[in-house]
Amino acid sequence: LKLSAGFVGFDGTENKRTLIAMDAVKKAAGIEGDINVLLRQPHGRAISILGKLSRMCGVKAYVSDEGDKAKWESFGFKIEGGFNDFFEASDFVMIGSPGGQETPYVEAGLANDCYVSLMGGAKRPKIMAELEEKGVEISDELKADFEREFFFGLENYEMFASAKPKVIQCTSCNTTGICRASLAARPLGLKMIMGNIDRRHGDPHTVVKASPSAIDIGKGVGHQGTDAGTVFEEVTYSIRASKAPTTVPHTSFLEFVFEGDVTTEDFVKSLANTREVVVMPYEDTGGRAHEWTSEILEAFLSGFERPISPEVYELIVSDSIIPVKLGDHTIMQVAMMVEQMSIAVPNHVESYLLCAGYPADKVHATVDEALNCVHGTWPDKLSN
């Protein structure tokens, strides 16, 4: 297999993590091809991460604007070519540009017969409308790609492999977390998930102009549950997304509604058996409580060697689940944590393997072993 991968927005919080992960998975899967990055104007963060990616992954750099070539070369980087050269050299393009800026890259990717993978925040209907306004022909097959459910490889890899799409949109960070939890809960008779996501609003790339002790409560349901509903159509989702101006992980407080009698032990066991889900004991065998999100992240991360910190590919779920019996249904109140910059990375990488034609029966094990993604119960009952 050979499939060269290109990254737009290579220095973004998710994309740089995806690039390093893809390099590891490409090698593990025996897939040949270059890893290319498209540069804009040089700035400190981009210069720093390009140096790291060059050392670790041997990336090849291209510039969007020929006027920036000399600037990048002055920092000691070799520039392979320009905007069109980047797309000609790439068979697969991961677009991680800021929201609302994806269309020209999608257009160039399709014009060069690239597979295009979008991150969760992209607005496909808007992108398709903008392409049509620019005179791009939208075939029935391409229209189906823009309207297809979100890609969540643990559930729908085989369906996507049969469809052979040119455009894929991966689940976002919180949607990925909801989908993994849904995958664990479905065998127990899951009917509905409702509740609230406290979305952190203090990421490294975000300047927060808000009270440090105030929360934006949000209006109506967020896209996260709605997007998960395209993957798990039999489940009803009603999830609000608020914003908390902190750097803690996104923290979801959700109610899982099951038909019939379900025990917390059943749910914990199913969560621990689901790929890329880790159950965190509220109280460990030594009697120490794990009740603060910052301490939970520190405790988990300390046991792994990963290229960029923080890097938590796993959904972390506290075992402090509160069961409620309501008639013929059981409701489980659950607290779970999503590290926004890295949880979707395994899914991004699977979108690349999908386009490379990698077999469905090997894909999840290959990704988890290459990235050392674990599932189970922390600290000593974890496996790939």
Task: Please provide the spans of the model-predicted regions.
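N-terminal Rossmann-like NAD(P) cofactor-binding subdomain of oxidoreductases
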Residues: L1-T206, V363-V367
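C-terminal substrate-binding/catalytic lobe of Rossmann-fold NAD(P)-dependent oxidoreductases
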Residues: T13-F75, N196-R199, H205-A335
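Active-site catalytic microenvironments for nucleophilic, acid-base chemistry
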Residues: A184-L188, V257, L354
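Electropositive phosphate-/nucleotide-binding environments in soluble metabolic enzymes
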Residues: G12-K16, E80, G99-T103, T176, ...
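Generic structural motif
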Residues: Y157, R200, E259-D261, V338-S342, ...
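A broad, structural surface signal
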Residues: E88, L183, K269, P346, ...
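NAD(P)-dependent Rossmann-like dehydrogenase/reductase catalytic/cofactor-binding core
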Residues: F304-N384
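Hydrophobic alpha-helical scaffolding
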Residues: T171, I217-G218, V338-M341
